[in-house]
Amino acid sequence: MAHRQEIVDFAMQFEGNPYVYGGTSLTNGADCSGFMMSAFKEFGYELPRVAAAQYESSQKKEISDIEVGDLVFYGSNIYHVGLYIGDEKIIHASTSASGIKVSDYDFETPSGVGTYLK
């Protein structure tokens, strides 16, 4: 299985690529959960398609225990997800205007943290 930093490094190369609602293409456009699903798939992980399901099937963690490579989830009904890259930052497919970008992990109050990594 992949090292946490490998997944982050892989995901970071797509910064600046487009946000496409319902998309799963790392180069032609993805939404938040499609971006996570496709990035993790590169390393043999099968994540569910939508953010809420990704949260449900992840191993839950306390925000104080967050590590590089963990997923940060947002919204009371979990509608958004980003990949924690360290230094209190995430990379995520944000909006159609900004695409895949780096943001502070607390740009919005996180609802939870989950991981698929050891």
Question: Where are each of the predicted segments found?
Answer:
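Catalytic cysteine-centered active-site loop
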Residues: 13-68, 115
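Catalytic nucleophile-His microenvironment captured as a short glycine-rich beta-strand/loop
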Residues: 71, 79-89
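Aromatic- and glycine-rich peptidoglycan recognition patches
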Residues: 2-10, 45-63, 85-118
